Curated annotation (Swiss-Prot):
InterPro entries in the record: NADH_UbQ/plastoQ_OxRdtase_su3, NDAH_ubi_oxred_su3_sf
Enzyme Commission (EC) number: 7.1.1.2
Transmembrane segments: 3-23, 56-76, 85-105
A single GO molecular function term of this UniProt record: NADH dehydrogenase (ubiquinone) activity
Catalytically driven reaction(s): a ubiquinone + NADH + 5 H(+)(in) = a ubiquinol + NAD(+) + 4 H(+)(out)
Lineage, uppermost ranks: Eukaryota, Metazoa, Chordata, Craniata, Vertebrata
Summary of the function given for this chain in its UniProt record: Core subunit of the mitochondrial membrane respiratory chain NADH dehydrogenase (Complex I) that is believed to belong to the minimal assembly required for catalysis. Complex I functions in the transfer of electrons from NADH to the respiratory chain. The immediate electron acceptor for the enzyme is believed to be ubiquinone.
Name of protein: NADH-ubiquinone oxidoreductase chain 3
The UniProt record lists the keyword 4Fe-4S: no
Family per record: Belongs to the complex I subunit 3 family.
Major localization listed first in the record, in broad terms: mitochondrion
Cell compartment(s), UniProt: Mitochondrion membrane
GO CC annotation: mitochondrial membrane; NADH dehydrogenase complex
Annotated keywords: Electron transport, Membrane, Mitochondrion, NAD, Respiratory chain, Translocase, Transmembrane, Transmembrane helix, Transport, Ubiquinone
Length: 116
């Protein structure tokens, strides 16, 4: 009990010391660059309402859908331990078929073409 109490006391004191150092140590000299919001890849002093590529948005949504497919199919190797593995195989086949049909539709509509 004394060892646990001593460890808790040491951790509490160390946490307080680190919090005080973090409060008193930082350099407080703000300038315009430090006060402006940081936007990765964009000019921070320019307009925030620049046009956004719709093609990029569609490709990003497609990436998210297929990433979700991978997340749904990852537990598939453990499906053979179920009492009815054919049901898991049926669901897996239907998910892959649905996503493949969606990909074919997107391909025929020209959604995957970057340049027109």
């Amino acid at each position: 009990m004394n060892l646990i109490l001593a460890g808790l006391l040491i951790m509490s004191i160390l946490s307080m010391i680190l919090a005080m150092i973090a409060f008193w140590l930082p350099n407080m000299t703000p300038d315009t660059e430090k006060l402006s919001p940081y936007e990765c890849g964009f000019d921070p002093l320019g307009s925030a309402r620049l046009p956004f590529s719709l093609r990029f948005f569609l490709v990003a949504i497609l990436f998210l859908l297929f990433d979700l497919e991978i997340a749904l199919l990852l537990p598939l190797p453990w499906a053979d331990q179920l009492t009815n593995p054919t049901l898991a195989l049926t669901w897996t086949t239907s998910i892959i078929a649905l996503l493949t049909l969606g990909l074919i539709h997107e391909w025929t509509q020209g959604g995957l073409e970057w340049a027109e």
